[in-house]
């Protein structure tokens, strides 16, 4: 099982969204205090919809508490300062992928101690960072892709049928089918 770690998250809606993503991906969520909200706040639950009760999560008092309770864990740390691009590393089945708080990321002293396992998402232009929920989803689904989507619930056949029916295509002839095939080829589905 993959593990997502949020170090001192500040925005409840981001954490709720990430919780929902973890449920969908079959990943465990680790939350390291202090957090900028209470875990039972409405904004956390609202962003996680009705999936929060299905989420496997643990809350830790501090970063040292997290390390003590997860000895020997392989931890990748997402930061804009990393040399390694997230898609260039091989994510192990039970690894941990850590993200820092929205306003400051992972503290420099932690990154220095773990330089070899820091990863980044490439960005263009004058952007300082991506939204935390988006960043988690990008890296988590790359790790799942590398592992062959081990807990996937569907082969996509029913989803393709539903998409075709939703567009009123019926037998999927013509341009729509070309677009679907392009999309699937582009995203390697």
Question: Locations of the language-model features?
Answer:
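Post-transcriptional modification and biogenesis factors for structured RNAs
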Residues: 1-189
């Amino acid at each position: 099982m993959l593990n997502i770690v949020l170090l001192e998250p500040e925005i409840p809606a981001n954490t709720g969204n990430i919780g929902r993503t973890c449920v969908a991906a079959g990943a465990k969520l680790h939350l390291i205090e202090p957090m900028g909200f209470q875990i039972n706040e409405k904004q956390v639950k609202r962003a996680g919809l009705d999936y929060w009760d299905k989420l496997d999560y643990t809350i830790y008092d501090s970063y040292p508490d997290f390390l003590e309770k997860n000895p020997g864990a392989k931890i990748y740390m997402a930061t804009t300062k990393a040399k390694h691009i997230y898609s260039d590393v091989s994510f192990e089945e039970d690894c941990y992928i850590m993200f820092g708080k929205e306003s400051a990321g992972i503290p420099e002293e932690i990154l220095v101690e773990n330089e070899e396992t820091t990863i980044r998402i490439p960005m263009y232009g004058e952007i300082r960072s991506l939204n935390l929920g988006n960043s988690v989803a990008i890296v988590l689904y790359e790790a799942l892709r590398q592992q062959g989507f081990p807990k996937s619930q569907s082969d996509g056949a029913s989803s393709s049928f539903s998409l075709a029916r939703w567009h009123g295509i019926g037998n999927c002839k013509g341009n729509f089918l070309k677009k679907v095939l392009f999309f699937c080829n582009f995203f390697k589905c």
